[in-house]
Amino acid sequence: MTALARRYDTQIHRRVTRTVMVGDVPVGSEHPIVVQSMINEDTLDIEAAVAGIIRLAEAGSEIVRVTTPSMAHAKAMGQIRKELRQRGCSVPLVADVHHNGVKIALEVAQHVDKVRINPGLFIFDKPDPNRQEFSPEEFAAIGQRIRETFEPLVTLLRDQNKALRIGVNHGSLAERMLFTYGDTPEGMVESAMEFVRICHELDFHNILISMKASRAPVMLAAYRLMADTMDKEGFNYPLHLGVTEAGDGDYGRIKSTAGIATLLADGLGDTLRVSLTEAPEKEIPVCYSILQSLGLRKTMVEYVACPSCGRTLFNLEEVLHKVRNATSHLTGLDIAVMGCIVNGPGEMADADYGYVGKTPGVISLYRGRDEIRKVPEAEGVEALIQLIKEDGRWVEPA
């Protein structure tokens, strides 16, 4: 299929990426897009950290990240993993490592399935306020230091068959990248590519890459440029999507969706996290809703409902809530709730079941395009449930 044809195709065509195993969870274009999050408990509080990880796993997080800012935190991950396994929780664990973290990373790699590093902070030198530029020789010398520091971690992860995320943040680019490329997507991409090339030279390919920023336009440009740069250099590593520091509430969700969904629609992205300033488990439904809205994963009922107008023959908002409350535990179904006959049958043609107001006080129930029966409005929701049961597609709520 040509690029132009893909642009107008109703199916999303994912960028082809290699499979990277994070524990027993495969990440890559041949697999469903993976949902993940991060606990906000102190890693040194073993019980609280374990409880937070279990809450996230039960909410649907398929990978869980934990911060490890010190050697003590890194060692605590061993006990956390042990406690989780004793409680029957096998969710893959990721250690988040930042400032000058190679010793921490080498320790924590023994206890987790993946290590995340930040290229801008992996070798952290205090910025020199008097510096005007980096000469090519200075730039290359720091690159050599990075390689010498990074190589032991790459070798360990490769030999233990663990994974690595090269996680660039727009707000923490290294000083030499800022001087050379500016505060730009180009600087973000080169920060990542420096580490990607080292991994490739050391025959380590269990890597994922992220290009996070707090502004969606910057994040979009960085991910697109990263994908193009990898394609040009012959790399096909998976992308981890996210808008960092998105905030909370409706705006935080909208901001994250604007960035993540746009890239997913372009075919970019193999795993995602929605970062909210809220309890981490509240991030998970947003992730699954983004994926479902694009047809990339179906994990809940898809509801089709008109916005209501003067033609509506029943209280659409109230009825939709009743239908949702009765059926939201089901998976894999499309249910349409339409207020009148004008748009009803046409708009819900792709739905498995339809609930349509045709005449006052009467509901028409549909299976696909076929009208099955008419029932009094007061019996509409129960009759819909009965129709689903007749088709063998009903399960009782847990």
UniProtKB/Swiss-Prot annotation:
Co-factor binding details: Binds 1 [4Fe-4S] cluster.
Entry's Gene Ontology BP terms: isopentenyl diphosphate biosynthetic process, methylerythritol 4-phosphate pathway; terpenoid biosynthetic process
Catalyzed reaction equations: (2E)-4-hydroxy-3-methylbut-2-enyl diphosphate + 2 oxidized [2Fe-2S]-[ferredoxin] + H2O = 2-C-methyl-D-erythritol 2,4-cyclic diphosphate + 2 reduced [2Fe-2S]-[ferredoxin] + H(+)
Source organism superkingdom: Bacteria
Keyword 4Fe-4S: yes
Sorted UniProt keywords: 4Fe-4S, Iron, Iron-sulfur, Isoprene biosynthesis, Metal-binding, Oxidoreductase
Function: Converts 2C-methyl-D-erythritol 2,4-cyclodiphosphate (ME-2,4cPP) into 1-hydroxy-2-methyl-2-(E)-butenyl 4-diphosphate.
Protein name: 4-hydroxy-3-methylbut-2-en-1-yl diphosphate synthase (ferredoxin)
Organism per entry: Synechococcus sp. (strain CC9605)
Upper taxonomic lineage: Bacteria, Bacillati, Cyanobacteriota, Cyanophyceae, Synechococcales
